[in-house]
């Protein structure tokens, strides 16, 4: 039963596999990026994270543990000198995997594995607010403001025309009343009794 046995065999014995990954970790820390197959790159990431975590501790015991893995002393000195400043408070994820394509000989998938520094992450965080701040700048435009002003101007005119239209029927209703008012004085008040007198004189006397 294969319990509590991490890692992949990769078709090699344990000693061959350990020697291969020790060489690969040394090359990765020395050149900061190497190309290998996908399966080896995923396993190499575990080795690199373990070594860098030990280097961030910086004590003597951690240095001796790294010396048992990395083959070159100058690479170990460089790693311990830059680990705390370069990786800072980053907890794991010290490497980046980028798939390149197929290898020409056997069409094996090839991956580029490289170290990630703390400065790259801080630069990305600084660039993000700049993009968001640049978006609201081009929103105000003169033609749009003119269109909005032109669209807003007819509204008061329509509001003014509505009371004017409402006042027109009132004026028209008042006009006939004004015209009808002067017609009443045309009938003189004195004529009515005259007609009554004339009618009484012309009427024949009653016979008994």
From Swiss-Prot:
Cleavable signal peptide: none
Domain of life from the UniProt record: Bacteria
Positions with biased composition (Low complexity): 151-179
Region (Disordered): 122-208
GO terms of biological process kind: translation
MF terms (GO), sorted A to Z: structural constituent of ribosome
InterPro entries xrefs: Ribosomal_bL17, Ribosomal_bL17_CS, Ribosomal_bL17_sf
Keyword vocabulary terms for this entry: Ribonucleoprotein, Ribosomal protein
GO cellular component: cytosolic large ribosomal subunit
Gene3D superfamilies hit by this protein: Ribosomal protein L17
NCBIfam families assigned to the protein according to its UniProt record, in alphabetical order: L17 (TIGR00059)
Family the UniProt entry places it in: Belongs to the bacterial ribosomal protein bL17 family.
Subunit field text: Part of the 50S ribosomal subunit. Contacts protein L32.
The protein's name in its UniProt record: Large ribosomal subunit protein bL17
Organism: Desulfosudis oleivorans (strain DSM 6200 / JCM 39069 / Hxd3) (Desulfococcus oleovorans)
